[in-house]
Amino acid sequence: MKKEEYLEKVALANLWMRAYYEKDEPLASDEEYDALIRELRAFEEQNKDEISKDSPTQKIAPTIQSEFKKIAHLKRMWSMEDVFDESEFRAWAKRAKCEKNFFIEPKFDGASLNLLYENGKLVSGATRGDGEVGEDITLNVFEIENIPKNIAYKERIEIRGEVVILKDDFEKINEKRALLNQSLFANPRNAASGSLRQLDTSITKERNLKFYPWGLGENTLNFTKHSEVMQFIRELGFLKDDFVRLCVNLDEVLKAYDELLALREKKPMMMDGMVVRIDDLALCEELGYTVKFPKFMAAFKFPALEKTTRLIGVNLQVGRSGVITPVAVLEPVNLDGVVVKSATLHNFDEIARLDVKINDFVSVIRSGDVIPKITKVFKERREGLEMEISRPKLCPTCQSELLDEGTLIKCQNIDCEDRLVNSIIHFVSKKCLNIDGLGENIVELLYKHKKITTLESIFHLKFNDFEGLEGFKEKKINNLLNAIEQARECELFRFITALGIEHIGEVAAKKLSLSFGKEWHKQSFEAYANLEGFGEQMALSLCEFTRVNRTRIDEFYKLLNLKIEKLEIKSDGVIFGKTFVITGTLSRSRDEFKALIEKLGGKVSGSVSKKTDYVLFGEEAGSKLIKAKELEIKCIDESAFNELVKE
């Protein structure tokens, strides 16, 4: 890299850093920014006499510019040096001249906060800012419930940590913002930072922020180990994460990194790495600091789950109900070992909200098995080659005219090939008729060869329909035909679910089955609307569907021997009338526990509220368990639940 290119990259890095810190509006993904900083460092290591004083490697953050007052930290708040793989980690340890006794904990992806206590009382809260001076957000800090306002320690002390938003709360915040037609937060970190810097404290309060401590600033304590410091902080009443380790050597640190990385998706809050810190405080003091970092600690970063790429096109998919879903075609990008080439755009209202165009640079996130999605459009990086994404007029599959309802655009042709295929795939899926061996690819193959063309045709398949088809041998054919025969004996609620009626899912299907039996499709609007949990929209959907398909449903009854499960509810037990929430990994499926609770007269809810009576938790329980403890709801493990059931 030449000096001119280096200076250009310094300017670009500063532009990205100011957008991130001052406006909470990133112009690049973390992965892009980290890569740029590493380029600068590589040049600077080889050209120490040409290092620009403006380089982001030489400072913590831009000067603060905001409506909040400034507040000086009593001791500087440092950033951490990033390491990205084993070799970089071992190189850091070698520079620190330490290969034993490390304190490690998760690196939460949130906003850093400095709390000042005097005479046992919280007197101020400030953002990191430039490390020396932050923003005075004291009023907002008082709205964070899990920050103690009084502590059992009278000396002046600065307690530092990370403010985060739990993943579930983040989704709720964005759902609410979407309804209000407000711009969505790109990620929980931006949401946490934005929530701390609200002029209206009531907004901060409703965001349900959490504070996790990670260290001290000013203090007069005499501990010799950082692990003792953290134990002291937690005894003052601060939240502790479950994953904290003392590692005796480098290999143990690497093992802990792998363990924490495996928990990444299951943690209730976002993590972007693991903090590794020398536990011996005397050695930390001896090592000291660089211009920007402490030499005794590092952030061992996880592989990026969010990256920047270019949107190069849009494909249209037709669902079983006829709804057209736009899917972004992306320049391939590797996200945590998976090559991502597409991302959902949900609907055309979402395209308008994002103001995304073909050839835009976009930020794409992938989380677990969730379909990749676009979280941000970098409009400032447009080059004049971008093209609008127009709303379609014709179905991409059958070319029939589409019905544009605003948010949803639908194909109304019931013979549209994509609609039929997706309806069949849904009909045979696990939560519906659960026909083992009849997966998506097999359905598409059978439809292509006209072996199945309707839902009913599944039950007319014969051995010779499969002969000559690729991959089908005698054993496989017989297994599939046996699975189809077994599906004839399914429960009525599964059949209702399988029909794919708009607004009618598994829970509603069970209610219909138990309330009306096989006559469920011959009821009035009033009968549907009066069911517990049903409303006008569901009743209208049922009336319209059954009006059109009543005869067809009766014909299905001739093909199937549907069973109606009678739910015998025990009304004299301790569970009767109680509401449960189930979270974490248990020895049996959630459906099994749900069925047992309902049989004993209880109810199972999907979210924790003040109306919840019990939270049944298993291993790696997440945000629901945290919220339950905050609301002082009774939390029981599987063993306690089994004892409760016996009573």
Swiss-Prot record:
Record bears the keyword RNA-binding: no
Binding-site residues for NAD(+), renumbered to this chain: 30-34, 79-80, 105, 128, 162, 301
GO terms under cellular component: cytosol
Family listed: Belongs to the NAD-dependent DNA ligase family. LigA subfamily.
Residues binding Zn(2+), per UniProt: 395, 398, 411, 416
Cofactor(s) essential for the protein: Mg(2+); Mn(2+)
InterPro entries, A to Z: BRCT_dom, BRCT_dom_sf, DisA/LigA_HHH, DNA_ligase, DNA_ligase_AS, DNA_ligase_CS, DNAligase_adenylation, DNAligase_N
NCBIfam families xrefs: dnlj (TIGR00575), PRK07956.1 (NF005932)
Role, per record: DNA ligase that catalyzes the formation of phosphodiester linkages between 5'-phosphoryl and 3'-hydroxyl groups in double-stranded DNA using NAD as a coenzyme and as the energy source for the reaction. It is essential for DNA replication and repair of damaged DNA.
Database matches in Gene3D superfamilies: 5' to 3' exonuclease, C-terminal subdomain, BRCT domain, DNA ligase/mRNA capping enzyme, Helix hairpin bin, Nucleic acid-binding proteins
Entry's Gene Ontology BP terms: DNA repair; DNA replication
Family annotation (PANTHER family): CHROMOSOME TRANSMISSION FIDELITY FACTOR 18, DNA LIGASE
EC number from the UniProt entry: 6.5.1.2
Domain BRCT: 570-647
Protein species of origin: Campylobacter jejuni subsp. jejuni serotype O:6 (strain 81116 / NCTC 11828)
Active-site residues annotated for this sequence: 107
Entry protein name: DNA ligase
